[in-house]
């Protein structure tokens, strides 16, 4: 989301969970990795200058115990110049030999 774009959600969606083991979702973090890379590139505002650019890529996976009712969650990433909101939904087929077909 560009820094000039305002992102708003309903109050029900603004729940923030900081703990790695969340009892409310009955889930726990299984894997977490953050990769960072830096490089010098031409500045967007002045191509005659060189700007420092840093990129961050995050990977996370979690396991949930049944019964769980997590449909989708929203994860927010903040920086000084941007806010990224990612909608994440569980992969019901990950540990299953038979495909998951939602009903209803």
UniProtKB/Swiss-Prot annotation:
Region (V (Cys-rich)): 19-104
Gene this chain is encoded by: NXPH1
Annotated organism of origin: Macaca mulatta (Rhesus macaque)
Main subcellular location of this protein, as a coarse class: secreted
Keywords per UniProt: Secreted
UniProt cross-references to PANTHER family, sorted A to Z: NEUREXOPHILIN (PTHR17103), NEUREXOPHILIN-1 (PTHR17103:SF13)
Protein name as catalogued: Neurexophilin-1
Keyword ATP-binding: no
GO cellular component, one term: extracellular region
């Amino acid at each position: 989301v560009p820094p000039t774009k305002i992102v708003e959600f309903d109050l029900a969606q603004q729940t923030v969970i900081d703990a790695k083991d969340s009892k409310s979702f009955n889930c726990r973090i299984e894997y977490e990795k953050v990769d960072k890379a830096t490089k010098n590139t031409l500045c967007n505002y002045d191509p005659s200058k060189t700007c420092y650019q840093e990129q961050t890529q995050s990977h996370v996976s979690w396991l949930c115990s049944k019964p769980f009712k997590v449909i989708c969650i929203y994860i927010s990433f903040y920086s000084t110049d941007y806010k990224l909101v990612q909608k994440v939904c569980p992969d019901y087929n990950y540990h299953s030999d038979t495909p998951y077909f939602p009903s209803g």
